[in-house]
Amino acid sequence: MKHLYFLSIALFSLNATAQLKDCATCATQVIKEQQISKLSIDELDFLTNDLYARKGYKFKDYEISNYFNEKPWYKPVIDNSKVKLNAVEEQNVKLFQERTAILKADREKLLEALRSLKAEVQRGHSPIPKDNYNEYFSKTIAKIDIDDIHWIKNQGYYSVKVDNFKGTNQYYISIDGSEVKIGWFEDGYSEKVSEDKIKEVYEICEYGVMESATYWRFKWKNQKLVFFIESVKAG
């Protein structure tokens, strides 16, 4: 019986912190903060749309409209002004909006910290110790457009590839939750030369291509961007 008792507690705790996946119960159940505490902005937007879809809201967005049109329960109305939320639904929408605002504010602070980091590095004030490929970091972050980072759930990403016939270099930033990775991948051959079969003046036999990867990792902690893992250069 003891084992069953502990198992029941474990299952209860798991259910209590389970994250909300849809709004099937949002019309009758007040959602708790713990149920959405780990959800991303995208997922919170989905919950809001799911709640409205269950009321028959007709979406203008093509992708969203197509998604809900495939649901057997979705019955879009002709006039969206006729869609009315009850008190419980209004409370849930407010919760989603408040949580979304918090996440958006934190994301903007992270992006601002990255903009400041890039500006400081370009002024010659790099936070990367000199024995951690500091000169490569300066070149890498200069290529990254912070304002063009796009997000899917809690992951943000931007990369740019530069091919100058001599070789191909990829510069990127990857954000996963509170972890930020800035990297540079160097390839010893040109994709353009290879694809177009461009002949060089001195033709030589094919040779092994030298590749190398360098990256630096940061932690977004207490509203600050902290360099926390030494850079790695492989190749």
Which ranges hold each PLM region?
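Bacterial Sec-dependent N-terminal signal peptides
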Residues: 1-21
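Short N-terminal segments immediately surrounding and downstream of signal-peptide cleavage
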Residues: 19-42
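Amphipathic alpha-helical packing elements
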Residues: 35-76
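Sec/Tat-exported extracytoplasmic proteins
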Residues: 48-51, 55, 100, 121-125, ...
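Compact alpha-helical subdomains of small soluble proteins
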Residues: 59, 66-104
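Short, aromatic-enriched amphipathic alpha-helices that serve as compact interaction elements
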Residues: 109-125
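Short solvent-exposed beta->alpha transition segments
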Residues: 130-175
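Exposed beta-sheet edge and beta->alpha loop/turn motif
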Residues: 167-235
